[in-house]
A protein has these predicted regions:
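Low-complexity, highly charged intrinsically disordered N-terminal segments
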Residues: 1-100, 109
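Conserved phosphate/anionic-ligand binding catalytic regions in large, soluble enzymes, centered on
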Residues: 121-127
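Domain-scale recognition of functional cores that engage charged ligands
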Residues: 91-119, 133-358
Length: 358
């Protein structure tokens, strides 16, 4: 049921693009010595809002075991049940099964300028590309209408479609990080922002983490406690040898100590989705949004690869009618799915990660 208007002719992404090498890019330029790398790492931490006090408290929690893979697991005495009727609103048949009143409430909110879209695009698609270090939002991932389209273009097309249906322009925000901000900004300039008529913002990250050496406790838990496929004898010996070497390295280097013996960018990590809403405050994007739309009340926040997410008037109206601060979208779980899911834990409705299951 998701619809969008994709740009055509000279407004769409060209079939081929010539890109000049980036002098500051990965692997470019002469090698740097350890002192220069340390200075660069310190500079990156300072520029991206590294909080040493929070980092220090996290290290203490990791060393004490308060934060660990094992402590994340629910107690074996926990009662875990499936959700019950009333825990979720079924939208699997599309917004048609929601009330007309919900649609009218949602349409009024959209035309009143009360909604903006925030697309989380700060990641480098490490799992998706196997560690290629790309900017996922800029990837021309699908051929639609005869041309390959990027995630950015598709999401802007959906906001454009909803806005044009109701005669308004919907503000759209893309969150970025130290990994993606420069590339995203340059790309949007090159494609003239896909001629998006509404307000368009980039929300650069203002929090960054410094990687730590893993603890032996967590390594052993991940390898010995969690289920995994057993390999043939020779492959299993090789895997066990590699893991034994990693445990020795963690002990010798210092468990939960800062990981700095690598390229500076490899020592940092984005802090995760939770921090993107506070980032809107820290980097001034929310202030700019409110100056543009003082009546703004609701944000639709979604991952850059959640292609079905768009401002649906009926779903928006259902959220507003509920009077709740947050409405989360969940999908039906299949047996082979990995990740989190919705369940009742000891009678309370919770989103539970698969790693936390007893």
């Amino acid at each position: 049921g998701t619809s969008a208007e994709l740009l055509e002719s000279d407004m769409s992404l060209s079939g081929e693009e010539e890109r000049a090498p980036d002098p500051a890019g990965k692997g470019a330029g002469p090698a740097v010595n350890q002192g220069e790398a340390t200075d660069t790492l310190k500079m990156l931490l300072e520029e991206n809002g590294f909080d040493r006090a929070v980092h220090g408290r996290l290290r203490e929690d990791v060393i004490s075991g308060r934060v660990s893979l094992q402590s994340n697991r629910l107690p074996s005495t926990s009662r875990i049940d499936d959700v019950i009727s009333g825990d979720v609103v079924d939208c699997t048949a599309g917004s048609e099964n929601l009330s007309r009143e919900s649609s009218e409430i949602g349409e009024a909110a959209i035309t009143g300028g009360e909604i903006a879209v925030v697309t989380l695009a700060a990641g480098a698609a490490s799992r998706w590309t196997g560690g290629a270090g790309t900017c996922k939002a800029l990837n021309p991932f699908a051929s639609l209408g005869g041309r390959h389209r990027t995630f950015l273009e598709v999401h802007l097309a959906k906001s454009r479609k909803t806005g044009s249906n109701l005669g308004v322009e919907i503000p759209h925000v893309f969150t970025t990080s130290y990994l993606t901000h420069g590339a995203t900004r340059r790309f949007l300039d090159e494609v003239s922002r896909y001629n998006y008529e509404g307000p368009l913002f980039l929300s650069p990250g203002r929090t960054v983490g410094l990687r730590m050496i893993p603890t032996v406790r967590d390594l052993k838990f991940a390898w010995e406690e969690l289920p995994e496929q057993q390999l043939d004898p020779q492959q299993q010996k090789l895997r066990d040898s590699v893991r034994s070497g990693m445990i020795d390295w963690a002990r010798a280097t210092g468990e939960a100590q800062d990981y700095t013996d690598n390229l500076p960018a490899q020592c940092l990590h984005p802090m995760g989705h939770f921090y993107e809403v506070p980032n809107l405050l820290l980097n001034g994007t929310l202030r700019a949004l409110l100056q543009e739309r003082p009546q703004l009340k609701t944000l639709l926040v979604h991952n850059v690869d959640t292609l079905g997410a768009f401002v649906d008037p009926a779903i928006l109206g259902t959220h507003l009618k509920s009077g709740r601060g947050i409405t989360l979208e969940v999908i039906s779980r299949q047996l082979a799915d990995r990740g989190g899911g919705l369940a009742r834990v000891d009678g309370k409705l919770r989103l539970v990660e698969g790693l936390a299951m007893p």
